[in-house]
Amino acid sequence: MDSSVIQRKKVAVIGGGLVGSLQACFLAKRNFQIDVYEAREDTRVATFTRGRSINLALSHRGRQALKAVGLEDQIVSQGIPMRARMIHSLSGKKSAIPYGTKSQYILSVSRENLNKDLLTAAEKYPNVKMHFNHRLLKCNPEEGMITVLGSDKVPKDVTCDLIVGCDGAYSTVRSHLMKKPRFDYSQQYIPHGYMELTIPPKNGDYAMEPNYLHIWPRNTFMMIALPNMNKSFTCTLFMPFEEFEKLLTSNDVVDFFQKYFPDAIPLIGEKLLVQDFFLLPAQPMISVKCSSFHFKSHCVLLGDAAHAIVPFFGQGMNAGFEDCLVFDELMDKFSNDLSLCLPVFSRLRIPDDHAISDLSMYNYIEMRAHVNSSWFIFQKNMERFLHAIMPSTFIPLYTMVTFSRIRYHEAVQRWHWQKKVINKGLFFLGSLIAISSTYLLIHYMSPRSFLRLRRPWNWIAHFRNTTCFPAKAVDSLEQISNLISR
């Protein structure tokens, strides 16, 4: 394709969040003219950011996307490695469950700082222009036209070759695509909300072990804590909304934490706990699925706009960043031909993003309940053992999702296959132990004892002579044995 044509391509990126700003970097490298429209003010100058601010877990997929635009080292240097889950039981006991091998870890990063860094990186490209406080009013993908409303309150029509919807779970771009025939959409609010709390530094250092994702699992709800660069921890309490609604006073909150998170109170402090708890109401969590992710060659959805997921597998940002990376790889493959790239992008990403959405739902149950069980710990130890002796044959689900770029839906399929293999292996092992035990029992048992086992009615005589079994009960058993022997 002629380079002058490529340079004339104009792209409107709707949304200047994590995925939107990263996608602007990817597209700017292709010499497209990029305009990013963000409804909020510039987060780098905002005095207070309201709403979602859950700490993020950056893993392999996200790092590969950042690496492709030359930002991996910068972002990684601002993250804190977390090598394992640290489980806090109700009794105060702590136990670590490694994520993978000693060299494998995820990174705790600040959403706010990461967004600022990505915006700054995008603005460094001369062909990128940021438009803050610009809200999308209309989107007409057939004609490649959008209407935006800036701070001057005057609607402005903008024409472009490609509209990229990166405007989050409540995407305006997606809402316009939903009016098109054969566009499928579903959403689900889970019955749990989240609330953020803070564990401040203690004597200038971390109040807990910093290189862990701390979890307080309590079956129907849980709390997690991720470390920050300033030696604090950001805690997130996930709980059904009806439970949040029961905590109306300061005493209610303190009593609740004393009952379910007693070891967290001295870490947070009662005063700060109450202050943070009533600062903002519990926030909802939504899961969104749609199909397809594109419309002709003029519009595409990325990140939460295409597949908002609950945060319990730590893959929301990573999946969104991988969207950008896959899109970039396809643009290379098809030489920037959007008519070829967009349909393949939808075909590849829809099964993967739906798979990680389902896994995230499943992982909430695992995090809040299963991690307490001995069987769960046994399974994790077995997975690590099998992976150690057969690294290319047996790969734990978490490793496939977090430390590789195996496609999400393929990871799920492989996980189900591996579970079947393990279950069959355990059944075979159990059967072998049972048969071996029976053989040894028979082989070393005296003939007289063996004869008693073969003839159940002889047991009755044995009970009559050696126990204080009631006589009437023995007589009843004799009657049954006589029927059996006939």
UniProtKB/Swiss-Prot annotation:
GO CC terms of this entry: cytosol; extracellular space; mitochondrial outer membrane; mitochondrion
Q: In which tissues is it expressed?
A: Highest levels in placenta and liver. Detectable in kidney.
- Tell me which Gene Ontology terms the entry assigns under biological process: 'de novo' NAD biosynthetic process from L-tryptophan; anthranilate metabolic process; cellular response to interleukin-1; cellular response to lipopolysaccharide; kynurenic acid biosynthetic process; kynurenine metabolic process; L-kynurenine metabolic process; L-tryptophan catabolic process
Kinase among keywords: no
What effect on the protein does mutating M367L have, as reported in its record? Strongly decreases kynurenine 3-monooxygenase activity
Coiled coil (UniProt feature): none
Query: What are the EC numbers?
Result: 1.14.13.9
Cofactor field: FAD
- What GO molecular functions are on record for this protein? FAD binding; flavin adenine dinucleotide binding; kynurenine 3-monooxygenase activity; NAD(P)H oxidase H2O2-forming activity
Cell compartments where the protein resides? Mitochondrion outer membrane
Pathway connected to this protein:
Cofactor biosynthesis; NAD(+) biosynthesis; quinolinate from L-kynurenine: step 1/3
User: What would changing F312A do, according to UniProt?
Assistant: Decreases to 30% NADPH oxidase activity
Q: Which domain of life is it from?
A: Eukaryota
Q: How does activity depend on pH?
A: Optimum pH is 7.5.
Query: Residues that bind FAD, according to the entry?
Result: V19, Y37, E38, A39, R40, A57, R111, L136, T172, D304, M317, N318
**Protein family (similarity comment):** Belongs to the aromatic-ring hydroxylase family. KMO subfamily.
Other remarks on this protein: Increased in neuroinflammatory conditions. Inhibitors are investigated as potential neuroprotective drugs since they lead to an increased level of kynurenic acid, a neuroprotective NMDA receptor agonist.
Q: What name goes with this protein?
A: Kynurenine 3-monooxygenase
Naturally occurring in which organism (per UniProt): Homo sapiens (Human)
Q: Gene symbol?
A: KMO
